[in-house]
Amino acid sequence: MMGWWSSGANNALDEQIDKATSSSLEDIALNLEISDIIRSKTVQPKEAMRSLKKRINNKNPNTQLSALNLTDTCVKNGGAHFLAEIASREFMESLVSLLKAVGPGTVNAEVRAKILELIQSWATAAEGRYELGYIGEVYKTLQREGYQFPPRVTVASSMIDSNAPPEWVDSDVCMRCRTAFTFTNRKHHCRNCGNCFDQQCSTKSLPLPHLGILQAVRVDDGCYAKLTDKSSKASGAPPERSFTYSSSPAKPKGSSMQPRNARVDDGFDEDLKKALAMSLEEVKSHSRGYVSSPAANGVTSNQPKPNGHAAPKAVEEEDEDLKAAIAASLADMEEQKKQHAAALKQQASGAASSSSAAPSALPKNDYELTPLEAENINLFSTLVDRLQTQPPGTILREPQIQELYDSIGALRPKLARTYGETMSKHDTLLDLHARLSTVVRYYDRMLEERLSKAYSQHSIGGYNLPPPRQAPGPYPSLQPNAPPAAGPAENFYTGEQQQEYSHPTTHQPYPQPTLAQYGAYDKRGSVSAPSSNQYPPQQVPQHTGNWGPASSAQQYGQQPSYPPNEPPQTAQLQQTPNPAHLSAPAPAPNDSIGTTPTADPSASFYFSSQAQQQQQQQQQQQQQQQQQPQQVPSSPPDPNMSPYPNLAQPLHSYQPSLPQTPASIPAQPSQPQQAHQAPPQAQQPYWQHSAAQQTQLPPVWQPPPSAAYAGYTQESFPSAPHHAPKQPVVEESLIDL
């Protein structure tokens, strides 16, 4: 609003005030025009107050009286913002100074009386208003000082009340459509309410005489509708029922308000009016062959005429057409009901055949809304929403809304039935969904039970097996029904097998026995009769007359067969046993170690002190068992027995093979691989050695403690030492025997 105030406007106001306060007769029209200028805030209220004060301080009493009358008119019509300037100390002290002036500056008695009258009336009208309280203080002060006021006249406070343009309100968005202001979407203020609007919401312009604004200024759409509605009511133009908005009679020239047709054309969009017209035409065209002649020309006949008057016949014809359309719609609904009832009866009786039912489609349910009815409902909802921003009486002057309301009101039972059917369908679908969910849940449970049952059966057949067998070592056992070994040399292997003959695994296939179980363990006995459970149960050979075809011979190489009646000595003379086979059991096919601990300098490193203690105890037990009578095998031995020779025979039969000199000891480590690759040329069965042992019992040869055979374990094979261990001393006396 500061843009309104300019020096040009102030100069124009000064000229008008000078003209109104001239010494001629008072011009009331000019006074009201000046008050409207002040009220419209075209000029600053302070500048207007100072212009009036200047004219009041004039030396001409007539000018002073005219200025006082003009000031009173402006106080009563200038608005609250001008009243605040009149009640200021600057203006009131100027009036008091005129009252107290003495000497040449004394004012005229009429001017003096007029000033006291105005102060008294203004103070009476401003009672109870805080912003105008200084006028009352001046009035009371003058009363105390003894100034004689004229008789008091009761003046209502409404005398000084006048509408003025409100203060402008600032905002970042449009206060109607909430669109943000940008560089292109500029901000505009409504002169009627002072709010912020954008361009599309404040395109209207109207003069505001109630605010003292006589020229057309910018207003928003809401204020425009309110002001034009008030103006149409004030003009006394009766509302007209027409297809579209018709113009009202022309206003007198003195009225600056726009006619009603301008408001109507701007208030509603053209497309909305076209939609209304098309909807009504469609309703009429869908009736049962009913086409009225006025209906075809209804849109053109109901358009506003140039003179602003609509034909009354068009209104009557429109009402008749609407009645006919409603009647046709009701008749169509009744016919649909009858068709639906007939279709239901036909389905119940079962008389309709598939051939006859194919060409004729079932009619729609009478409770279903047609697309046209749904469109009318949506259109009516849109119109009602648009009416929220229209003046209160707009709904009474819109025949289209009334017609839509009547037609939609007839659809309420149909809509209620549609809603009920939809709810029943919804409940049915919910019930079916619950049943389906239950069935699916039962089916899933059944599948889970079947799967679990199948898995359990499969686990019994293949996955739930008993514990795995013990991992076989290098000397697995034979069949449990193998015949026992003959001779006292096999007594050591009748018990549990030593754990040293197997690789240490997670499962202990061979438990560790105590040392007391090895009753007749010595160097010779361990070689002559190994335990029957040291060999894998691959095949159980048949009892034959010779040893060669046995299955165990396939593991340890081809061995010569001897008849049972051959003397042991003859076999011993023909045999030249290898010391590697005499001192250690034959290895498994996957084992390359076959030398004796005493003959191999590298192998003697692998025996611990525990093995030495074990050997000493076994030698003592062997001496006790050798005193007992030994049995000679009366029948050929079981081919399942070990093919190793029994070294318990007289030592003179194999003296050439046992003596070893220190010079020959270093050459022994190369024999194990050769012994494993090539079998010996001649080797005696163990029963011949047993027979020779019974004939002659030589003194027992005590081997050194370090020569005891403790078996092979996984811990017994570290990296071969690079130094030659100390060899035990061999007794020469035993060699001479």
UniProtKB/Swiss-Prot annotation:
GO terms for molecular function: phosphatidylinositol-3-phosphate binding; ubiquitin binding; zinc ion binding. The keyword Zinc applies. Keywords: Endosome, Membrane, Metal-binding, Repeat, Zinc, Zinc-finger. Residues 229-265, 285-319, 332-364, 461-737 are annotated as: Disordered. Its main location: membrane. A zinc finger (FYVE-type) spans 168-228. It is found in: Endosome membrane. The keyword Membrane applies. Residues 465-486 have a biased composition (Pro residues). Pfam families: FYVE, UIM, VHS, Vps27_GAT-like. Residues 243-259, 294-305, 528-560, 568-578, 592-609, 686-697 have a biased composition (Polar residues). Residues 267-286, 317-336 form the UIM domain. One of its GO terms (biological process) is protein transport to vacuole involved in ubiquitin-dependent protein catabolic process via the multivesicular body sorting pathway. Transmembrane segments: none annotated. InterPro entries: ENTH_VHS, HGS/VPS27, UIM_dom, VHS_dom, Vps27_GAT-like, Znf_FYVE, Znf_FYVE-rel, Znf_FYVE_PHD. Gene3D superfamilies: 1.20.5.1940, 1.25.40.90, 6.10.140.100, Zinc/RING finger domain, C3HC4 (zinc finger). Residues 18-150 form the VHS domain. It is a peripheral membrane protein. Belongs to the VPS27 family. The FYVE domain is involved in the binding to phosphatidylinositol 3-phosphate (PtdIns(3)P) which is required for the association to endosomal membranes. Both IUM domains are necessary for efficient binding to ubiquitin. This is Vacuolar protein sorting-associated protein 27. It comes from Chaetomium globosum (strain ATCC 6205 / CBS 148.51 / DSM 1962 / NBRC 6347 / NRRL 1970) (Soil fungus). The lineage of its organism: Eukaryota, Fungi, Dikarya, Ascomycota, Pezizomycotina. The gene is VPS27.
